Curated annotation (Swiss-Prot):
Name of this protein: Elongation factor 4
CDD domains associated with the record: EF4_III (cd16260), LepA (cd01890), lepA_C (cd03709)
HAMAP family: LepA (MF_00071)
Gene name per UniProt: lepA
Key words of the record: Cell inner membrane, Cell membrane, GTP-binding, Hydrolase, Membrane, Nucleotide-binding, Protein biosynthesis
Family affiliation: Belongs to the TRAFAC class translation factor GTPase superfamily. Classic translation factor GTPase family. LepA subfamily.
Membrane topology: Peripheral membrane protein
Biological classification of the source: Bacteria, Pseudomonadati, Campylobacterota, Epsilonproteobacteria, Campylobacterales
Source organism of this protein record: Campylobacter lari (strain RM2100 / D67 / ATCC BAA-1060)
């Protein structure tokens, strides 16, 4: 056991984490150069395309050092803010972490968040400066940033280039000498932490575990502690990107995959504890929670008969990603669909893209919303995710909305524009710190609702892509909020309702009806597009009717004849207006997203 090292890699997107993992794998000789594909650790196509790691992957490597065989378990973690829960459970399975920072870009916001998780878990952190082959690399500046922001001594930081392979050997030797071996206790009751789970078409739901105490052998009966369900261990193996290595037993301190023959990943929830039935652990491993959805959106199939296909697709995705929540909902405008909960915006994009790509569905997504707490006058508290569920104004005492702590690192030349954007988004400054004269760290408390629409895109375009951003939820706070409804031809369009701050309601309403006017097709009768709060109309635009020349068939003749025809047309239009239906195109639902 003293020769096992469990470690993970912490890095911001694009700082070269997956490439570094590939280099370490090939240096240990786990995969021959012929079979080595870029980003071995990333298994989903969408991960390779977007260059991000979504699911935590693992690999067991063997390395000979000072005439002793060592086992290195590399546990890959996602770098993106939405997947910080996956990061926390991956890091809890390790004794050490490599903090990878790009030599040309320096420390970024998401790196800080993940380092703090590692420090909370008392991991040994090894600073690694990557991409030293780049002409723009500034190693001393990056060392200063790591020491200033994170407070880790960088005098012995390891400089590598994952692309060319410089410094990789030295890095592996540092992992062996610096990261402690797992503390183990073979005699204690078995405790194993599930830090990832996925679905395999042949073997069912698989649990990737780190054994803390005791051991697990094939054919033993195990107990999953949160559900109290019992299962027989059908198979055990060590993780490997190409072909898993079978084993009869997982000892304490080891990382491995358990096959229990389950049909559903929800039965092996990430963060749960597995123990043996015959010698049960007294308590589960602490510090874990179920992944919570923060952002909600309605997903509707464009072809209404595809509703069941969408349900099947969501069921299948749920097998692999237990953090998605969904329930059926109906909309008068869009028909049948689902209200789906996501970990964050990137997660929402990835899921929508996977539904469209892997299951050939065409989907309409409504504007993303967050959870609101509604305190009613009768003392009842409601939690709603859909604006159309908001009770009437006279029944509401006050509304609370979720706030997040946003951390932003930006070049100082963009600071003014950025602060203007944050103030417009109702942000409150908590801290401002100059890391170097050229880079600033900002901390803001900001309502989650202001971030979910298009904040990230605006931040990137204001700072030419140089700023980085991360957020974590803090609490619910009272807000002066109202529901803005959109009426088209007198009918409420429920899918376009949004909850907005009272002071922005008027301008938002005006912008929305203006945007809608451009999109709604002209009808034979005039169509009014109105924005309302409760029963009060606050903005209105008219879509002019298409003219039809009813007097064309009169050749000369009496003016009263023409008047009679025009009066008749007026009557017809009035009747049509009363019963006419307007079909809204897909762009109308997207226009809500583009309003600032």
């Amino acid at each position: 056991m003293k020769n096992i090292r469990n470690f993970s890699i912490i890095a911001h997107i694009d700082h070269g984490k997956s490439t570094l993992a590939d280099r370490i794998i090939s240096e240990c000789g786990a995969i021959s150069d012929r079979l080595m594909s870029n980003q071995v650790m990333d298994t989903m196509d969408i991960e390779k395309e977007r260059g991000i790691t979504i699911k935590a992957q693992s690999v067991r490597l063997n390395y000979k050092f000072n005439n002793e065989e060592y086992v290195l378990n590399l546990i890959d973690t996602p770098g993106h803010v939405d997947f910080s829960y996956e990061v926390s459970r991956s890091l809890a399975s390790c004794e050490g972490a490599l903090l990878v920072v790009d030599a040309s870009q320096g420390v970024e916001a998401q790196t800080i968040a993940n380092v703090y998780i590692a420090l909370e878990n008392n991991l040994e952190i090894i600073p690694v400066i990557n991409k030293i082959d780049l002409p723009s690399a500034d190693i001393e500046k990056v060392k200063h940033e790591i020491e200033h922001i994170i407070g880790i001594d960088c005098s012995s930081a390891i400089c590598v280039s994952a692309k060319t392979g410089v410094g990789i050997k030295e890095l592996i030797e540092t992992i062996i000498t610096k990261i402690p071996a797992p503390k183990t206790n073979d005699e204690a009751p078995t405790k194993a932490l599930i830090y990832d789970s996925w679905f395999d078409n042949y073997l069912g739901a698989l649990a990737l575990v780190r054994v803390y105490e005791g051991n697990i052998a094939k054919n033993e009966e195990v107990l999953i502690m949160s559900t109290d369900k019992r299962h027989i261990v059908q198979d055990l193996f060590y993780p490997h990107p190409l072909s898993p290595i079978k084993t009869k037993k997982l000892e304490s301190g080891e990382v491995g995959v358990i096959v229990l023959g389950l049909k559903n990943v929800a039965d092996v929830q990430v963060g749960d504890t597995i123990t043996l039935t015959k010698n049960k652990a007294k308590e589960a491993i602490g510090g874990f929670e179920k992944a919570k959805a923060f952002v909600f959106a309605g997903l509707y199939p464009i072809e209404t008969d595809k509703f069941e296909d969408l349900r099947d697709a969501l069921d299948k995705l749920k097998l692999n990603d237990s953090s998605i929540t969904y329930e059926p909902e109906t909309s008068l405008a869009l028909g049948f669909g689902f209200r789906v909960g996501f970990l964050g915006l990137l997660h929402m994009e990835v899921i929508k893209e996977r539904l469209e790509r892997e299951f050939n569905l065409d989907l309409i997504a409504t504007a993303p919303t967050v959870t609101y707490e509604i305190y009613q006058t009768d003392g009842e508290i409601l939690k709603i995710q859909n604006p159309s569920e908001l009770p009437p104004v006279n029944k509401i005492d006050h509304i609370k909305e979720p706030y997040v702590k946003a951390t932003i690192i930006t070049p100082s030349e963009y600071l003014g524009n950025l602060i203007t954007l944050l103030n417009r988004k109702r942000g409150m400054q908590v801290k401002m710190d100059y890391i170097t004269p050229e880079r600033v760290l900002l901390e803001y408390d900001i309502p989650l609702n202001e971030i979910v629409m298009d904040f990230y895109d605006k931040l990137k375009s204001l700072t030419k892509g140089y700023a980085s951003f991360d957020y974590e939820p803090i609490e619910f706070r009272v807000g002066d909020l109202v529901k803005l409804d959109i009426k088209v031809a007198g009918e409420n369009v429920d899918a376009l309702s949004i909850i907005v701050p009272n002071e922005k309601a008027l301008s938002k309403g005006r912008e929305l009806v203006k945007a809608m006017k451009e999109i709604v097709p002209r009808q034979l009768f005039e169509v009014a597009i109105q924005a309302s709060i409760g029963n009060k109309i606050i903005a209105r635009e008219n879509v002019k009717s298409m003219g039809k020349n009813v007097t064309a068939k009169c050749y000369g003749g009496d003016i009263t004849r023409k008047r009679k025809l025009l009066e008749k047309q007026k009557e017809g239009k009035k009747r049509m207006k009363a019963i006419g239906k307007v079909h809204l195109p897909q762009e109308a639902f997207l226009s809500v997203l583009k309003i600032d």
